Amino acid sequence: VVRKYNIDTIYNLAAILSATAELNPMLGWNVGIGSLVNCLEVARVFGCAVFTPSSIGAFGPNTPKDMTPQDTIQRPNTIYGVTKVTGELLSDYYFTRFGVDTRSVRFPGLISNLTLPGGGTTDYAVEIYYSAVKGEKFICPLEKGTFMDMMYMPDALDAMVDIMEADPSKLIHRNSFNVTAMSFDPEILYNTIKKYIPTFEMEYKPEPIKQAIANSWPNSLDDSCARNEWGWNPKYDLDKMSVDMIETLRAKLGK
């Protein structure tokens, strides 16, 4: 495909998400790392650039929780996180050893109004909007006070394009940049949605696997390196995202 269509940049998005990967660790490893190695080898042979997303899952319980630095201890305790750290190191290796133009960002939880949740620890932040728009009580799988970074999908797509178009001479870091747009816990998200859907109700029923994963991740990220090195600047905050999510889902669901 790369040869036939003269591809210059490969976006490798294959992964089994965090909670699902814990149920089948080897599948998580094989999908996450197997796909990356294939892409890196193709890029080495044909001279392509490669973008592979990392994640806040690349951090672990010993990582500083608040304003997590760009360069810090990682040591994740999930197979998803292990694949992400491995991916960061492999990508850097292919850059330094073979000159492959590898770049990456550590995505927070991504919130989409198009794609349904798929087994991630942060997926509650998508599911909650569906419940609110449908007029259903939301059962939250995480405890009150569980803060995590999040980002609306339009900003995530911008980040994927912008980093690959950035001037390489300005990139001190490559694999992988902290990026974020907002940080909240379920209660803050619930109260934000209630401003627009006052009858919305939520009940807490934490799921042990998801809660343990969330507890090992940062509360907030320092993304100053991304802002300084390639101009990262998200457009959506929590309120702006919530308005757009609710409007889009109402149209999508006919509510």
How should each PLM-predicted stretch be described?
Residues 6, 10-12, 30, 37-79:
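Conserved Rossmann-fold NAD(P)-dependent oxidoreductase catalytic core, especially the SDR/UDP-sugar
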Residues 19-27, 61-66, 116-117:
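Conserved catalytic-core motifs of eukaryotic protein kinase domains, centered on the activation segment
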Residues 1-31:
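NAD(P)H-binding glycine-rich loop region in Rossmannoid oxidoreductase-like domains
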Residues 33-39, 83-91:
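Conserved catalytic Lys-bearing alpha helix of Rossmann-like short-chain dehydrogenase/reductases
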Residues 92-147, 153-158, 162:
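NAD(P)-dependent short-chain dehydrogenase/reductase
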Residues 27-29, 66, 72, 77-88, ...:
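Short-chain dehydrogenase/reductase
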Residues 12, 49-54, 58, 103-109, ...:
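Structural signature of the Rossmann-like NAD(P)-dependent dehydrogenase/reductase core
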Residues 141-143, 148-255:
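C-terminal substrate-binding subdomain of Rossmann-fold SDR/epimerase-dehydratase oxidoreductases
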